[in-house]
């Protein structure tokens, strides 16, 4: 009986240590800044400005203020690794022709890999011209759960705080 108690105590100690150690590696959910609210689904969350509305379709969510202006779109697709090795050169070869076919001229493309709050993110940024309107786009591509999400912030007027806040609050629970 003493031996069983000893074994149980050791097992509980090991389980407790594992729980503590695994908790150390887990990213903490970021705080949502004042003036922002939370977009959240089963696999992903980030902050967007209060007062903006989120409308969800079959594979896209559009988040925007009333009227025309800056906006955020969230598009999801089946989990894929095709963006993991994305470079400016591969963007220009694979994706830029699609933008041009829609009448969008893209320039100043940058691609970076970043890790906000433990999430592996590919950041794709560019300047664009469409129908005479200048736009800046920053896309954050992140895989979580069974999906790969592309969060795109489109700016008709520069708003560095919007781009920064969306990025700094991306959370997948990793």
Question: What do these predicted ranges mean?
Answer:
Residues 32-38, 58-61, 115-125:
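Short, hydrophobic/aromatic-rich segments at coil-to-beta transitions
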Residues 56-60, 133-139, 162:
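Short, surface-exposed coil-to-beta transition loops
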Residues 42-88:
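Secretory pathway targeting signatures of secreted, lumenal, and periplasmic proteins
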Residues 19-23:
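C-terminal motif of bacterial Sec signal peptides marking the signal peptidase cleavage site
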Residues 1-10:
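Bacterial N-terminal signal peptides that target proteins for export
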Residues 96-143:
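Signature of long, low-cysteine stretches enriched in small and polar/charged residues
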Residues 25-27:
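Bacterial signal peptide processing site
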């Amino acid at each position: 009986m003493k031996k069983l108690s000893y074994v149980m105590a050791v097992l509980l100690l090991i389980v407790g240590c594992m729980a503590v150690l695994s908790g150390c590696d887990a990213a903490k959910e970021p705080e949502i800044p004042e003036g922002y609210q939370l977009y959240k689904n089963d696999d992903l969350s980030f902050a967007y400005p209060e007062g903006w509305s989120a409308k969800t379709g079959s594979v896209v969510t559009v988040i925007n203020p009333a009227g025309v202006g800056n906006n955020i779109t969230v598009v999801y697709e089946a989990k894929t690794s095709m963006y993991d090795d994305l470079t400016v050169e591969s963007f220009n070869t694979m994706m830029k022709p699609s933008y041009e076919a829609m009448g969008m001229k893209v320039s100043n493309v940058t691609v970076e890999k970043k890790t906000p709050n433990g999430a592996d993110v590919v950041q794709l940024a560019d300047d664009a011209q469409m129908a005479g309107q200048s736009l800046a786009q920053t896309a954050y591509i992140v895989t979580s759960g069974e999906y790969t999400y592309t969060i795109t912030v489109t700016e008709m007027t520069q708003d560095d705080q919007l781009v920064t806040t969306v990025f700094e609050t991306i959370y997948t629970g990793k």
